[in-house]
Amino acid sequence: MSLFLGKPSTPLVKVGDHVKLGQKIGESGGFVSLPVHASVSGEVIGVKSQMMLMDRPEMTVTIRNDMQDEWIDLTPLGQDVDSVAPSAIIPAIQEAGICGLGGAAFPTHVKLSIPEGKRCEAIIVNGAECETHVTADHRLMLENPGDIVDGLRLAMRAVGVETGIIAIEDNKKDAIAAMQQAVAGIAGLSVVSLQAKYPQGSEKQLIYAVTGREVPSKGLPIDVGVVVLTAGWASAIADAVLRGKPLIQRVTTVTGCVKEPANLLARIGTPVSELVEACGGYTQAPYRVVMGGCMTGLCTPNDAVPTGKRTNCVIALTEKEAKTQAEGPCIRCGRCIEACPMGLQPYKMRQLCDKGDLKAAEAANVMECVVCGCCTYICPARRQLTSIFKNTKDAIVREARRAK
């Protein structure tokens, strides 16, 4: 019931209920929340709290798949983009449970609800996909460029902007060609080729690379007149508005020590083990299984963990690939400062985090950290900087909520 950033959904079903594919099984908990839908048809066999990623308990609904894929009645808003009323698009996106398909999984309807006093001038589709191993959006751009363009146009129609940009790294020349063909002749749409580097796909870095505008400290993309969606995000919008389908599946890269690495169209909630089985199984017992890319992903406690809306990749790593070395003392080399795309001072932030001084860490701009992993990767002392910053950011957010 916590497939997204925001207040968890409330279960609407109980053990023994029969549900259809696409049926709402969780009610939204508020504005910054989303409904949850059944990704298979079948019988509900469990409604309980379970330990998930990062050893956090989350309310879950388990459905025994009857393999019938019995859909609910679908109600599209129109047959094409131009036939859809702009005012109906954002409510449809919210009802479909659409959120970012990576990163924080931020609810799309919130992102497209422009605050009073702000103005959106352009929507950017993030096709950079800069993290190693992850190729889900690349495959989607090759196989389904039309839906990405339709989703972008629907988002533009909902917000009332005339400029849409699809940004792709220059190492994906086939995707650039496919998207250029898809936008040909459509006013206001363009495809931009970006230098392939990490973390080019990070939201703030992407906006600067495409527009030259710098999102201010503690600011949001809308502060510089921009909204950013991913390719998968745009495709899901087209599915919801033009076909009436809620977000119940996504493309996920499965790679590492598996026999046949592949991009799979996977139902939300599918256990990692079943994705691996679909790829022929493991070539050897994995030392770690990571959800997400190698730089920003999270280790799973086991491969029985279900995939979520933000699961863009599953990587099975061998011991040689994943075993970490013991931390050494900081040698003040400054490499973390040079590597940080946000211009922060990671070594100094780590000192403050180790002291547990949340106020000082916040004053040192730890909240500006985009958790890209560059500082940890470059550190010769093998200091776990990124994970400490992520934990500190979470602690600061919890303290702020308690203070309210």
Model features per residue range: what roles?
Residues 9-18, 22:
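Short histidine-centered loop motifs in beta-beta connectors
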Residues 19-33, 48-51, 58-65:
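Short hydrophobic beta/alpha edge segments that flank linear recognition/processing sites
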Residues 42-44:
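Conserved hydrophobic positions within beta-strands
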Residues 51-106, 117, 173:
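Acidic low-complexity segments
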Residues 71, 100, 123-137, 258:
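Gly-rich Lys/Arg/Thr-decorated short loops/hinges at beta-loop-alpha junctions or inter-strand turns
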Residues 142-157:
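Histidine-anchored nucleotide/phosphate-binding helix
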Residues 162-272, 278-285, 293:
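Hydrophobic alpha-helical positions that pack around
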Residues 311-327, 337, 341-404:
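Ferredoxin-type iron-sulfur electron-transfer modules in oxidoreductases and energy-metabolism complexes
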